[in-house]
Amino acid sequence: MADETEIQAAAPAEAAPGAEGQGERRGRGGRGRGGNDRGGDRGRGRDGRGRRDDRRGSEEQGEELIEKLVHINRVSKTVKGGKRFGFAALVVVGDGKGRAGFGHGKAREVPEAISKATAAAKKAMVRVPLREGRTLHHDGNGHFGAGRVTVRTAPPGTGIIAGGPMRAIFESLGVADVVTKSVGTSNPYNMIRATFEALKDQTSPKSVSQRRGKKIADLLGRGGASAPVAEAEAAAITE
């Protein structure tokens, strides 16, 4: 009886190495398939990135931005092994409601350069006050480098009298009537920066009245308008 008990007790001990081998094989299989630990983490990582992209897409779709490709050129970088060629893109982005920005991006491929420039433009958007939502409040000048631009307010029906990079800015900004003039260099980068310098100086009667602590009608009345006309114009100003 004692021998039989020893034999039965030894049987599970002999089966233990096989069980350990199966456990090791299962462990290797889990790592190989990537289904238990690290594979699950990778899956969650992909899903997480996908959800973040979807959120960004929904925000961009709700904003409905206007994107204009202004200029693209080929660039090169000299390194130890020779030259690396790529592309540089200049993009203007706006919402058509008084906000616009520009961005510059470089990459080895054209689509990637445009994508980088668009992302930079969205981060650099500025608000420009518009009169009646169609034109500027007053004339302005801007310069950058050798480029100098002049922007003027215009009556209804004038349209956008601008060319090249400046037209892209006003179309994305939502301006319907404006007269512009560019003097000096025709470099699109300088023209874009000079135009934004002129737009940053734009002020509205509402902001001036808040800064000076006066009524909008009082400011408009100083231009020679009668009190009723000044009050009507002040009531029509939204920004």
Swiss-Prot record:
InterPro entries to which the protein is assigned, alphabetical: Ribosomal_Su5_D2-typ_SF (IPR020568), Ribosomal_uS5 (IPR000851), Ribosomal_uS5_bac-type (IPR005712), Ribosomal_uS5_C (IPR005324), Ribosomal_uS5_N (IPR013810), Ribosomal_uS5_N_CS (IPR018192), Ribsml_uS5_D2-typ_fold_subgr (IPR014721)
Region (Disordered): 1-62
One cellular component term from this protein's GO annotations in UniProt: small ribosomal subunit
One GO-annotated biological process of the protein: translation
UniProt xrefs under Pfam families: Ribosomal_S5, Ribosomal_S5_C
Listed SUPFAM superfamilies: dsRNA-binding domain-like (SSF54768), Ribosomal protein S5 domain 2-like (SSF54211)
Biased amino acid composition, Low complexity: 9-19
Basic and acidic residues bias spans: 34-62
HAMAP family in UniProt: Ribosomal_uS5_B (MF_01307_B)
Protein family per UniProt: Belongs to the universal ribosomal protein uS5 family.
Swiss-Prot/TrEMBL domain comment: The N-terminal domain interacts with the head of the 30S subunit; the C-terminal domain interacts with the body and contacts protein S4. The interaction surface between S4 and S5 is involved in control of translational fidelity.
Function as written in the Swiss-Prot or TrEMBL entry: With S4 and S12 plays an important role in translational accuracy.
Protein name according to UniProt: Small ribosomal subunit protein uS5
